[in-house]
């Protein structure tokens, strides 16, 4: 019985110390001056193509992580990103109709013991631990890991059988840093830091040349 109580006390103490550490780091982040260079996201490529009865999406992001975000990663904070794409059809009499969609979830974390970067990629939300039915890759540098996130190629967003060549349709795309996956103190502090407000949305009108 004594051993059980001791184990619980040690676990509680560890969790308390970890919570205090995150609270302190979040407070320092909120009070820190704005960095001259901040995180940014833009697009250098956004196009679709028809292949084997499917409509495929190709995106090339111009993604840069600011110093505050990189610093948090190096200190052990895992960061989650989400990319969503939907094919929609205009309807003047009701909400636009969704014809297809695709999502990708990314979890980026630094492994201090091996000094390597781990990136998990999945079509489903990734747990905080990163343990899920996801593809896991390890990289020597942060740049290599970010390059994988930047290149989003041959994503199937819809079946061509659902595309009406005579209708008005478009692809809506969004990429963002998922703040909801951060520890609660960081969620509050992130609102004051441009580094943590990574969010880009674009739309592409489908033309007959793209889908024929």
Language model regions located:
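N-terminal secretory signal peptides that target proteins for export/translocation
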Residues: 1-16
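Bacterial N-terminal signal peptides
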Residues: 15-33
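Boundary at the C-terminal end of the N-terminal hydrophobic targeting segment
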Residues: 34-41
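Short, well-ordered beta-strand segments enriched in hydrophobic/aromatic residues
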Residues: 55-65
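Glycine-rich, aromatic-bearing surface loops/beta-hairpins
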Residues: 154-212
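A beta-strand/beta-hairpin structural motif
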Residues: 58-60, 138-160
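Short structured motifs
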Residues: 41-47, 67, 103-105, 154-159
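Structured domain cores in non-transmembrane regions
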Residues: 71-143
